[in-house]
């Protein structure tokens, strides 16, 4: 039988439980979210519902998610009631789908995130940078997994050349044949929690099965015409790995809408900010007609990739809009950093 320590319990969460000062509550980790019911890791596996007080008091992003540690009221039956969510060490978020401006948490208390990119026409460096930005806000270590290497034997170097400038760890693998699975497992230390992120059809379920050594996750087909996949993972679930780590599999993400602040783009686009600091004038707008602009000079010399810079401008613009929607007052109080970048 696994203990709470096996699921990642540590002093951080113990302090959160003690702060509640409710000795009748016990700790548990959320293993799966089935909508109206959550599966918990307790001394015995239990299903749980949320208390009415928690449902009405918490914002949607603060309700229990897969990976969360929670305080639970246990009963003699198979069920339990979640009374509180313990303070998180990390959360990976995006803007929720739809017209409302809401934060959606995809996974919590994660140490390392594997961002899967398929080595086919679905590969997208701009999309990858969106993931890296969100992970930088979460303080989660990113590892890019270049999957389906068996389909791109002659083109692997081409894809690697697009990842290397991002200064991120990467692993080339073929989940279908298990190639690279051992390297991925070595990247998850005992007690650490990892999550698989990526679009539908990139092979997350196949990789989950390879890492677990069994066909636990359903695997779906990919459309030939565009290499797009259908959702085969319908819910988020946390699994225990043989080496002592844990793995969260997630449904495919069709669109990663950003959630954050434009001023935090400096980590993902360190090169752009470094060039901006070299401009002749401190009030440089980095437009094509600016004199002494280091960014324009780098674009002309191809030192700075135009697609990379355009993606920076797109993400910066998207985050500005998000900021004004979260709080319209922010529109009058923008910081000067990214205000200097023109959209050209």
Regions flagged by a language model, labelled:
Residues 1-125:
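N-terminal accessory targeting/assembly segments
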Residues 2-4, 24, 59-76, 87-106, ...:
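Helix-rich effector regions associated with P-loop NTPase G domains
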Residues 141, 148-202:
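Canonical P-loop GTPase G-domain recognition
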